[in-house]
Amino acid sequence: MLNNEYKNSALKIFSLKGNEPLAQEVADHVGIELGKCSVKRFSDGEIQINIEESIRGCDVFIIQPTSNPVNLHLMELLIMIDACRRASAANINIVVPYYGYARQDRKARSREPITAKLVANLIETAGADRMIALDLHAPQIQGFFDMPIDHLMGVPILAQYFKNETDIDPEECVVVSPDHGGVTRARKLADILKTPIAIIDKRRPKPNVAEVMNIVGEIEGRTAIIIDDIIDTAGTITLAAQALKDKGAKDVYACCTHPVLSGPAKERIENSAIKELVVTNSIQLDEKRKPENTKELSVAGLLAQAIIRVYERESVSVLFD
């Protein structure tokens, strides 16, 4: 817990249904109780939200990842923003540990929507004033918003685990990006761990199907750490792990900020060359979806610090590294 000085302040933290354990942990770090609100369903599936305490003049922080079921959690968030606006909250801040639709950030083919931008429009129209986000799939999504975005990174949390809680020797380790787009992320982890990096040249013939083609970098005899922002069906990560093993990697670890883990992900990871999967709790994982060799790290402390700094009108940039 950081402190208790916010118990009777104008700082209010609310949780919807997206990740209640994470929200509770954040509130515990800040030193306040979660705000009282009810989220119910009508018999026809419509969402009803009721804020059960006064928030007039308060700085409200709504914690809600828009993870599976994406549309339901997104609608909960939009309705809660509207409720806070109509209840005269001074500032409505949304804390989105996982931003759904982030992979639809551009037109890859003709006549496709840019859904990440549409979601940004919906959030701003509903009345949000600021967003605290964690590892957006494409950092340029920040430009889809006109309101301030505090974009936090999960890499330091992952790095501290490998640095302090494993017996990996940095001199015999290599950080691997599963594609060219993740090189910046891999470089950041490698800089913290003081290791070299490698890149996997990947060809994706159709969605959710990946084929590993080539590895650029020294792999043989090293412990490889593959890092990505999202692991969804785990096709990319498991093929990458096998390719690294085939190139002589000693052990293969995989890590990500957002464990979507849909479809065959659990089975693929458990039957792969991956020794351990390291993830954060940005998305609430039930046991049915969690591979046996999974280590879950908490981002609650990071989010709590960001919330306090925003509330105190202090710089958040110190948390970016």
UniProtKB/Swiss-Prot annotation:
Residues binding ATP, per UniProt: D44, G45, E46, R103, Q104
Binding-site positions, Mg(2+) 2: D179
Coiled coil: none
Residues the entry annotates as binding Mg(2+) 1: H137
Compartments, as annotated in UniProt: Cytoplasm
Recorded catalytic activity of this chain's protein: D-ribose 5-phosphate + ATP = 5-phospho-alpha-D-ribose 1-diphosphate + AMP + H(+)
Cellular-component GO terms for this entry: cytoplasm; ribose phosphate diphosphokinase complex
Record-linked InterPro entries: PRib_PP_synth_CS, Pribosyltran_N, PRibTrfase_dom, PRTase-like, Rib-P_diPkinase, Rib-P_diPkinase_bac
Binding site for D-ribose 5-phosphate: R204, D228, D232, T233, A234, G235, T236
SMART domains assigned to the protein according to its UniProt record, in alphabetical order: Pribosyltran_N
Single GO MF annotation: kinase activity
Record's subunit section: Homohexamer.
Function text: Involved in the biosynthesis of the central metabolite phospho-alpha-D-ribosyl-1-pyrophosphate (PRPP) via the transfer of pyrophosphoryl group from ATP to 1-hydroxyl of ribose-5-phosphate (Rib-5-P).
Name of the protein in question: Ribose-phosphate pyrophosphokinase
Organism: Staphylococcus saprophyticus subsp. saprophyticus (strain ATCC 15305 / DSM 20229 / NCIMB 8711 / NCTC 7292 / S-41)
The encoding gene: prs
